[in-house]
Amino acid sequence: MMLERTTAAIGPLDEQAMATAADLQSRLTKPAGSLGVLEELSVRLAGLAGVCPPPLPEPAAVAVFAGDHGVHAQGVTPWPQEVTGQMIGNFLAGGAVVNAFARQTGATVTVVDVGVAAPPTSIETAPPESATASGARPRLVEANIRRGTRDLTVTAALTRDEARAAVETGIRVADELVDAGAAILLTGDMGIGNTTPAAALIAVFAEADPATVTGRGTGVDDPTHQRKIEVVRAALRRHEPDPADPLGVLAAVGGLEHAALAGLILGAAAQRVPVLLDGVIADSAALAAAAFAPSATGAMVAGHRSVEPGATVALRRLGLTPLVDLGLRLGEGTGALLALPVVAGAVRVLHEVATFDSAGVAQK
């Protein structure tokens, strides 16, 4: 089956390529280690690609997975559920923050409806001004598995078959984007209420207390935040999800966009293409992906540190260092897009910077 074939194809980083990259970094015209995290990142990307220098992360593709959540009925957010579908229309019209940042970086935007409760509204042909520098306009992939998840405090959010379908949708999207030429994939998400299942997923996979991983999402007040924590606790008590069964965890307390993002990450890792994580939704999905295939972490790059507390817990569990910390909590892929030039810079150093010998520069 697709999921099993994909996880079987995910292997470890190429140690020889990493050693070559580390050696090259030590001979470039700069003090050893002076580029900090960027040096470590360039070495890891060489290991992922199996060659030094690794390919430049161009062109880039953002995949924004959208879904709704039955737990919305528990009052975990003041935002109405129909905003999810309305925002899809905004993405396709080029009017969201993700579109502005994508135009700045030249990344394409693909919006994937995996579980929106109501058909997306205001979907029209994207205007010319929504296009990136390459001329690509935002596009919609209709892959709705069900019209929103079930309320995870009452029953499992998804069946195992639905969770598998979402994961495999993400794998297919990764395959399609890479086949179309993408050299790096960026995670995006849209779903009113989706930080609640994200907190539940992180609590399970990181073995953390819900109070330490449940944040304020869109900025809820204290009573709503406390209710949200209790909702996560109640869901975990009801389902007792087993972190050794990632498909079961996604079915019990996940969301369709979380499962699809896990699939996107697995698909990228199987193709040995880096995937740049956005915020807490992507971080929770990355934990699920790592539970399916531990070596998938080799393809993951943490774009930024979300202010959602679960993001820090998840990244620590994954062993990933966020590239930027700007106090973001929007989602959509915005933080990943802001970090994209940092990733490109890390790789470009290996391609373009002279060595001490080639430049005729003396060493200490």
UniProtKB/Swiss-Prot annotation:
GO terms for biological process: cobalamin biosynthetic process. One of its GO terms (molecular function) is nicotinate-nucleotide-dimethylbenzimidazole phosphoribosyltransferase activity. The active site is at E332 (proton acceptor). Disulfide bonds: none annotated. It catalyses: 5,6-dimethylbenzimidazole + nicotinate beta-D-ribonucleotide = alpha-ribazole 5'-phosphate + nicotinate + H(+). Its EC number is 2.4.2.21. CDD domains: DMB-PRT_CobT (cd02439). It is an enzyme of class 2 (transferase). Belongs to the CobT family. Catalyzes the synthesis of alpha-ribazole-5'-phosphate from nicotinate mononucleotide (NAMN) and 5,6-dimethylbenzimidazole (DMB). This is Nicotinate-nucleotide--dimethylbenzimidazole phosphoribosyltransferase. It comes from Salinispora tropica (strain ATCC BAA-916 / DSM 44818 / JCM 13857 / NBRC 105044 / CNB-440). The lineage of its organism: Bacteria, Bacillati, Actinomycetota, Actinomycetes, Micromonosporales. The gene is cobT.
